From Swiss-Prot:
Gene3D superfamilies: Sodium:dicarboxylate symporter (1.10.3860.10). GO terms for cellular component: plasma membrane. SUPFAM superfamilies: Proton glutamate symport protein. Belongs to the dicarboxylate/amino acid:cation symporter (DAACS) (TC 2.A.23) family. The keyword Cell inner membrane applies. This is C4-dicarboxylate transport protein. Responsible for the transport of dicarboxylates such as succinate, fumarate, and malate from the periplasm across the membrane.
Length: 445
């Protein structure tokens, strides 16, 4: 019987080979953002050139192009290594129930904080509706029935061509079950899919080298278009989002962790290396393989980790959920649009659906935001251009919250299944773990 397969991520740094600070991606991105602010402030005419704007838009598109193959490979791999089909269904139901409850807490928290601290008031922005038209086209309004039917693709090729995550996810689940049913005959194809995932993560590593260019273009264009005065409100939104995400991790995830029997801060320390990878890439998927390996070493069931973590990257994005409701309120405040209690309930209900299509890759949360705004009030959609400039700042914390949330989810579902090794959990969280001990590898037994 084969052991669980895990996929190397090329972003994992080797110990003992410290880069010069100017070669660190996060430093480069911060430098690019500062330069973008200066260019937008000192030369607004140049900064609003369509080619400058295209730098930011192009980077987001580069990231989005690899979302579908990543989701397919990780979900198929997770399911294909489980031998009991009934267990897949049982674990899946428990995971989805957990995802829905915790995601709802994140969405509600964003609404509460956004109402208590209306940092968008006074911005009085009047953005161009065409600035974000391409995002709106990908997130058109649909009814609940349309949403369910939309999950079923007209063709598998079409699902991948359009990059529709929920359609790809459905096919991946079915394909994983079919591969699992093949038994030994399916092992060769399963290994091919694992190898394909290696290549996709390699593409991400290449694309992320362009992150500073994308950040420069997005920031320069926004400051050039709206002026440096917009920074005050935007910084307020960033600070509020940081604080809300931290509150969620400590209050909600911390409570869940305590219920299971571990300390959330020790858990964060345990996955600190994965968090640093995420911080440098602003993509929670860049650390997915390492996270899965560490969760198994922590005492979680291999089969639970293989199913819960990849699925959580579409269904359990806590940071993205907080961002969606908080950003929606900020945009409404900035545009001077009053949202009634009924409107905000609608935001919550719509976001509970649209958030399930978000992926843990940079830019996906922004597209999902378009779907929420278009469904609640189309007049809010042009305001997305306001927050796009600072999306890089918020993307970092979104990704950090997402990966922490998915890690806690795997531990909780393993505990719920009665397959959590509490002795290993306590032992690993009570000591520092060398990153070299958790190098991921493809293993077969």
């Amino acid at each position: 019987m084969s052991a669980t397969t895990h996929i190397d991520a090329p972003a994992l740094p080797k110990r003992g080979k410290s880069k010069p600070f100017y070669k660190v991606l996060y430093v480069q991105v911060l430098f690019a953002i500062v330069v973008g602010v200066l260019v937008g402030w000192l030369s607004p005419h140049f900064a609003t050139n369509e080619w400058i704007k295209a730098l930011g838009d192009g980077f987001v598109k580069l990231i989005k192009m690899v979302i579908a193959p990543i989701i397919f490979c990780t979900v198929v791999s997770g399911i294909a290594h489980i031998q009991d089909a009934r267990k897949v269904g049982r674990v899946g139901i428990k995971a989805l129930l957990y995802f829905e409850v915790v995601s709802s807490f994140a969405l509600v928290l964003g609404l509460i904080v956004g109402n208590l601290f209306p940092v968008g008031h006074g911005l009085a922005a009047k953005p161009d509706a065409g600035a974000v038209a391409k995002y709106v086209d990908q997130a058109s309004h649909m009814s609940a029935v349309d949403f369910v039917l939309h999950i079923i693709p007209d063709s598998v090729v079409g699902a991948f061509a359009k990059g529709d995550i929920l359609q790809v996810l459905l096919f991946a689940v079915l394909f994983g079950f079919a591969l699992m049913a093949l038994g030994e005959r399916g092992h060769r194809l399963r290994d091919v899919i694992d190898d394909a995932a290696h290549a996709v993560f390699g593409v991400i590593a290449i694309v992320m080298k362009a992150a500073p260019i994308g950040a420069f273009g997005a920031m320069a264009f926004t400051i050039g278009k709206y002026g440096p005065a917009a920074l005050g409100n935007l910084i307020g939104l960033v600070a509020l989002f940081y604080a809300t995400s931290a509150l969620f991790v400590v209050l909600v995830l911390g409570t869940i962790a305590k219920f299971v029997g571990f300390n959330i801060f020790k858990f964060i320390g345990y996955i600190k290396d994965e968090l640093l990878i995420v911080l440098g890439t602003s993509s929670s998927e860049s650390a997915l393989p390492q996270l899965m390996e560490k969760l198994e070493r922590l005492g979680c069931s291999k089969s639970v980790v293989g199913l819960v973590v990849p699925t959580g990257y579409s269904f359990n994005l806590d940071g993205t959920n907080i961002y969606m409701t908080l950003a929606t309120l900020f945009i409404a405040q900035a545009l001077g649009i009053e949202l009634s209690f009924g409107d905000q309930v609608a935001i919550l209900l719509v976001a509970m659906l649209t958030s399930k299509g978000a992926s843990g890759v940079t830019g996906a949360g922004f597209v999902t935001l378009a779907g929420t705004l278009a469904a609640v009030n189309p007049a809010l959609v042009p305001g997305m251009a306001i927050v796009f400039s600072i999306d890089k700042f918020m993307s970092e914390v979104r990704a950090l919250t997402n990966i922490t949330g998915n890690g806690v989810a795997a531990v909780f579902v393993s505990w719920w299944e009665g397959e959590l090794d509490h002795d290993r959990l306590r032992a690993n969280l009570s000591r520092n773990v060398d990153p070299s001990d958790v190098e991921t590898a493809v293993t077969t037994g």
